[in-house]
């Protein structure tokens, strides 16, 4: 979102932690369901000036709890608002409880599962897109296109919570930083991943670029999501065959 210079109206959930550095990705956070109302207010107050500059983010459980009426309000009042539903298929922030979108009751019994895409369309949203949050380039393309629409749109960013026991979350080979190629730019560190660390080490890499340190990946914490490799412009992050 920072890359696209968007004003992000946030909500209540694990993504609220993105308000703080190094992500600094959220600009407002008041209460559950407020993100969509805030984005709608900015759209009406700023008019065309807000087009392509504001996006609301809300988790799947929070959306089902108190975001549906906000989205309906956007459609009813013809707002040009893009809502990104961060769907990790659980109520992650408070202990990974089930909700109407998981297909299970709080007792763990199988039940009806709400389809978020169909729900958004039933409220009158014509443009509903699904993205994989682990494909940064695809997410950027979709968000850039949707925020420019002069009408409501919804982007569902779907991937299981990495702590989920029921669903298999993203899991690949752990990655490693090639110390000879790392330029020390810290782009990977700005992801806020707990597996990444900074090693103070003045010198130059094999390309002759001076640096004050380099990144390092703890293979035991890395789940192989590849986000760090995607943001590295120097090809310094690759698969690590050994733990």
Features from the language model and the residues they span:
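Generic long, charged, amphipathic alpha-helical segments
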Residues: 44, 50, 174-181
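Short glycine-rich anion-binding loops that position phosphate/pyrophosphate groups of nucleotides
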Residues: 14, 159-162
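Cofactor-pocket helix-loop regions in the catalytic cores of large enzyme subunits
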Residues: 1-20, 65
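Iron-sulfur cluster-binding cysteine motifs and their immediate structural context
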Residues: 183-216, 223, 227-243
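Conserved helix-loop functional segments at active or binding sites
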Residues: 6, 14-17, 41-51, 194-202, ...
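Thiamine diphosphate
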Residues: 19-156, 164-168
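Active-site lining segments that contact anionic ligands and/or coordinate catalytic metals
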Residues: 5, 78-81, 125-128, 149-154, ...
